[in-house]
Amino acid sequence: MALLHKEKLIECIDNELQNSGTLLLLTKNIVVSEISYNGNDYKYFTFNENHDLIGQENLKGATSNNIAKMVYNWIAKNPQTNKVWVGEPRIRIYFKNNLYHTNNNHVCIKDFYKVSISVSPNIFNDRSIWCTKCTSFYPFSSILSPNLFQ
């Protein structure tokens, strides 16, 4: 069962990247990494806490699926008890376009939360997803009811 949920979560990230989405990883509300599609390849950017660019890399030959698996594995291997970069290990995942919104029902948020807690109940305790339609962060831990956004 967990494998199906893991695959669903990877598919969610993969679909976003395939549709020219941008994936941002944030720590304490600060963007520290970005993965974007730039025509032929994906680019990986890293930033410091002032949002100064400190590194960039062309991910030549990478597919949206490889990247999705890498992101999933990175999240899974950094539980909340570990330090991620510097400071409080709060990870947010940002989907730039509206791919997962259906009738303003926040499908992206509900699916991502449901899948995440099915993989590991405590993995996303302090993690959240950016909703582009209502432009705010929703903590996974407060999305307890499937009816919350209906």
Swiss-Prot record:
Keyword terms, alphabetized: Early protein, Metal-binding
Cofactor names: Zn(2+)
Induction: Expressed in the early phase of the viral replicative cycle.
Keyword Metal-binding belongs to the record: yes
Domain of life from the UniProt record: Viruses
Cofactor: how bound: Binds 1 Zn(2+) ion.
A Gene Ontology molecular function term of the record: metal ion binding
KW Metal-binding (keyword) present: yes
Record note on quaternary structure: Monomer. Homodimer. Interacts with protein B119L. Interacts with membrane protein E248R.
Cited function: May participate in a redox cascade for the formation of disulfide bonds in viral proteins.
Protein family (similarity comment): Belongs to the asfivirus A151R family.
The protein's name: Protein A151R
Organism: African swine fever virus (isolate Pig/Kenya/KEN-50/1950) (ASFV)
Lineage of producing organism: Viruses, Varidnaviria, Bamfordvirae, Nucleocytoviricota, Pokkesviricetes
